Every structure is written in C-alpha cells, then in structure tokens.
Regions:
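Positively charged, low-complexity intrinsically disordered leader regions
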Residues: 2-29
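Conserved N-terminal subdomain of the carbohydrate kinase-like
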Residues: 20-32, 49-130, 144-150
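A short, N-terminal amphipathic alpha-helix
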Residues: 39-52, 201-204
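Short catalytic helix/loop segments, enriched in acidic residues and glycine
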Residues: 28-43
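Structural motif
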Residues: 11-13, 127-130, 152, 178
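Short beta->alpha connector loops
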Residues: 59-61, 133-138, 158-162
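Conserved phosphate/ATP/ADP-binding segment of small-molecule kinases
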Residues: 147-152, 161-229
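Short beta-strand scaffold segments in enzyme catalytic cores
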Residues: 43, 91-94, 218-222
Length: 230
C-alpha cells in the first residue's frame, strides 16, 4: 500500500453505529446525547474528506437535528436507514476517576440487531473505507459490496468480537490495511504481553499499520520496522 495523503480521502465510506449515549462521570451526567462510531468517524473525516457517506441504521426516535448536523458538515446521510417503528441503539455507561475504567449500565441494541448495510452505487468505489466497531460479518458484507479496492481500509474492533466471533474477525482483518484496537485487545488478539511483540504478531495478518489506543496515555502507531507514540 502506498503512502496515504489527505488528498487521497476525496471519497470516504464510513460504516458504523449512529446512536444515543448517556454518560456518567464523577462530575455529572451528560443525559441523552448523540453517539456512535459512525457519527464521530464521519465528523472527524469531514475535516479532511471532500465527500463522505455514513452507512448505518437508526430508529424513529432519532432526531432530525442530528441528521442536519451531519449534513451541514457535508456528510452524506442517505444511507442511514430509518426504521420508523424501531428505536435507535442506546448505551449508558459510567466512567470512574481512572478514565481507563468504565461500567456499562444499559445497552439497548434495538434496530442495530438486524442491521444489513447497503452501500450506495456512488460509494462502491471509495478512496478510503472505514469500518466501525461492528460484527465482523457486517464489516465483511460491506467489503463484499465494493467494486474497486480502496487506497486504505481501516478497521475498528473490540474484545467482544474476539470472544464471540474470532475466526470471522481474523478473516476480515486479512482484508484491511489498518486496524485500530486498544492495548488489552492487542494483547488478546496476539497472545503477547508486550505491545511491541503484540504489534509484530498482528502485522502477520498482512496489515500495513496498527494503531493501539492507550486511553489517557494516547496511542501507538506501528508500521513496518518502525513505531512511535501519538
């Protein structure tokens, strides 16, 4: 894979959750707020990609103002399916004084349980594809719909899928260039305790880059024969 630059991100396909969160901390509660991996990947990409699309699903309770927010940022939302008689994915959690620790209080999968992503014709030839944290088979179905190989495919995943769908996850990882996971997930996926050893083992899937998140301590980027802290 050649070096990716900002100009390569003209057309970016994003698949992930568009959701509602409720977050408690020692300082107070957010109440019901806009959340989801698809949402925040898209908002981040809006600073770089000239044209991006989010593929997701929401319920009839999803507020129009939140779609308007994405649209105002130049993000295509026509591939966000709205199931009028269903409810949007909802997560409530509590963070402790140690921000690396959190408790899940409520998870309501709702319409996401039967999410079947459909990529529009226009975005079957993206420059960059970003696969948010979803079931590996959902991520695979997106890759299967693409007509051309993107310059970069970025995959986010988590320990839950390693516990419940490991072989499916490994199959998808072999088809992407970049993976994003946290330090504990890197150790679990690789079977190694050292992050350096973990990254080296994970690169055997054929990955170009590995991003390992370390909470309040930032992240580490690993490439071929090199790594640095972010």
């Amino acid at each position: 894979m050649k070096k990716i630059t900002i100009t390569d991100m003209k057309k970016t396909l994003i698949v992930g959750t568009v959701a509602y969160d409720d977050i408690e901390t020692a300082k107070g509660s957010s109440g019901r707020v806009l959340g989801g991996s698809g949402t925040y990947i898209a908002l981040a990409c809006s600073h770089f990609a000239s044209h991006s699309s989010v593929v997701s699903v929401v319920g009839g309770d999803f507020e129009q103002r939140h779609l308007d927010l994405l649209n105002k940022k130049g993000i295509e939302t026509s591939s966000i399916e709205i199931i009028s008689n269903g409810k949007t994915f909802y997560w409530k959690g509590k963070y402790h004084n140690d921000w690396n620790k959190r408790d899940t209080i409520i998870t309501e999968v709702n319409v996401l349980e039967k999410f079947n992503p459909i990529v529009s014709e226009e975005f079957k030839t993206p420059d960059v594809a970003v696969l948010g944290n979803l079931h590996p088979l959902v991520q695979k179905s997106v890759l299967d719909q693409l007509k051309t190989a993107p310059k970069a495919i970025i995959l986010d995943t988590m320990n839950f899928w390693m516990d419940t769908a490991l072989e499916d996850l490994k199959s998808v990882i072999r088809r992407v260039n970049i993976i994003v996971i946290n330090d504990e997930e890197a150790k679990q996926l690789s079977g190694k305790e050292s992050l350096l050893d973990a990254a080296e083992e994970i690169q055997k899937f054929g990955l170009k880059y590995i991003i390992i998140k370390k909470g309040e301590h930032g992240a580490m980027l690993f490439g071929e024969n090199q790594h640095f802290n972010l």
